């Protein structure tokens, strides 16, 4: 593949409506990170491009209320030479939950909570020294949809 600074993305998805009120989707994403041009060619250190698997579902509990939930697993193919104190990544899994509340014919309020748990990545510096890269992410969202 040619080198570019933004990786190409391959996506496949399938959705199914089990009932008129219950839907689910399964997705796979592959980012061609090893073919992207990064600073100091650090993409060459990756074991493979990024793999993501996602699953989600929506349930219309009532005419005015829809709830949803989802899961995402991300595997970056990390290696020690890819990680630095300035820029690092960690494999992760995420869980999200949300609700859409239909306020009027034209106005819907959306509320969501999203939590990402990152795997610790340990980079061996020497026989006695190591760096552990770690983080977590929790997001709360609130929004409105207006249909004209």
Model regions and ranges:
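Residue-level signature of outer-membrane beta-barrel architecture
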Residues: 16-18, 59, 101, 146
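Membrane-embedded beta-strands of outer-membrane beta-barrel proteins
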Residues: 12-14, 26, 55, 97, ...
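Transmembrane beta-barrel strands of outer-membrane/channel proteins
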Residues: 26-30, 69-73, 97, 111-115
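Extracellular loop and loop/strand-boundary signature of outer-membrane beta-barrel proteins
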Residues: 2, 39-44, 80-87, 126-132
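Outer-membrane beta-barrel "beta-signal"
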Residues: 99-101, 113, 135-148
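Residues that define the transmembrane beta-barrel architecture of outer-membrane proteins
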Residues: 6-10, 49-53, 91-95, 136-140
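Structural signature of outer-membrane beta-barrel domains
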Residues: 21, 31-35, 74-78, 116-120
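Repeated loop/turn-to-beta-strand initiation elements of outer-membrane beta-barrel proteins
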Residues: 21-26, 64-67, 101-111
């Amino acid at each position: 593949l040619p080198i570019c600074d933004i990786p190409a993305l391959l996506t496949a998805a399938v959705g199914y409506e089990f009932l008129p009120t219950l839907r689910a989707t399964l997705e796979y994403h592959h980012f061609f990170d090893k073919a992207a041009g990064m600073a100091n060619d650090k993409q060459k250190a990756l074991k493979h491009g990024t793999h993501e698997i996602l699953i989600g579902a929506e349930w219309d509990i009532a005419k005015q209320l829809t709830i949803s939930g989802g899961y995402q697993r991300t595997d970056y193919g990390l290696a020690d030479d890819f990680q630095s104190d300035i820029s690092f990544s960690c494999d992760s899994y995420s869980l999200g939950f949300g609700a859409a509340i239909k306020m009027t014919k034209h106005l819907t309020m959306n509320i969501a909570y999203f939590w990402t748990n990152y795997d610790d990545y340990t980079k061996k510096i020497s026989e006695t020294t190591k760096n552990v890269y770690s983080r977590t992410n929790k997001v709360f969202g609130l929004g409105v949809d207006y249909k004209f």
